[in-house]
Amino acid sequence: MNVIEVEDVSFRYGNSREYSLRHINLEIRKGEFLGIIGPSGSGKSTFCLTLNGLIPHSIAGEFHGNVIVDGLNTREHSVSELSTKVGLVFQNPDSQLFNMTVLEEVAFALENLGIERDEMWRRIRWALKLVRLWDKREEFPPNLSGGEKQRLAIASVLVMKPKVLVLDEPTSQLDPLGREEVLGLIKLLNKEEKITIILVEHNTDFLLEHADRIVVFDKGRIVLEGKPEDVFENVEFLRTIGVKLPTRVKIGYELKKRGLVERAVLTRDEVVEVLKWAYLRGKS
């Protein structure tokens, strides 16, 4: 069952002659983990903005096509209404945090929706425990670490109970520990909470391991789509457009060029076994 349907969507910002999105068609299944990759400026972030109605309602430009979210056409419904269907998390958590405490930050959106007090507290407690910030609920958000800030930004979206969580490079400004915390949370939300995940991420190693499907953007178009192991077999093409390859794909590709394997995308165990075999053969 599809939770999002994107139908022939094109978009051009008001101050630009060029289209940032060109004839995008995509169906996203309920519960799916979709990874989005592509070079800078390829349209990934713009695409994310179409999924919760910021485009066309809040961002000026020329918009064509339709985005259907859980049966609602984004043209016909407000951003506030769509926010209960699709939650959006940006690169920089500081741009989304502006309250005095962690608790107030998470409560803010619910107060604006007029949620009953008992239900509001149930959601706040659930979200903060899920992102492991309940014990820091009285903290001043700027005092949190980078990973904690991003987890707080995610919690402030989760309390809306969206069916889909869209994350636009949420780890790009984090240190290794912060990245690990946020990516671990994203896995949990998909596997345990059954939330549909749409993740724009340069960490292709993570996407190869955990995404159900990957979409590749270039110059405003979808140029590749499929299972991670199928997408990453297109090594030369991905290198040509500037996509970072997963580590074991780079290793597998070099082994393939040497005639040691038939495909570039290998499991971790396969990489170890082939390297071990090549090493032993070299010693004999």
Swiss-Prot record:
Keywords (A to Z) from UniProt: ATP-binding, Cell membrane, Membrane, Nucleotide-binding, Translocase, Transport
GO cellular component, one term: ATP-binding cassette (ABC) transporter complex
Membrane topology per record: Peripheral membrane protein
Annotated EC: 7.-.-.-
Record-annotated ABC transporter domain positions: 4-244
GO molecular function: ATP binding; ATP hydrolysis activity; ATPase-coupled transmembrane transporter activity
Residues binding ATP: G38, P39, S40, G41, S42, G43, K44, S45
Family annotation (InterPro entries): AAA+_ATPase, ABC_transporter-like_ATP-bd, ABC_transporter-like_CS, ABC_transpr_CbiO/EcfA_su, ECF_ABC_transporter_ATP-bd, P-loop_NTPase
UniProt-annotated location(s): Cell membrane
A matching Pfam family: ABC_tran
Gene3D superfamilies named among the record's database cross-references: P-loop containing nucleotide triphosphate hydrolases
Keyword ATP-binding included in the entry's annotation: yes
Function: Probably part of an ABC transporter complex. Responsible for energy coupling to the transport system.
Family assignment from sequence similarity: Belongs to the ABC transporter superfamily.
Protein name per the record: Putative ABC transporter ATP-binding protein PH1815
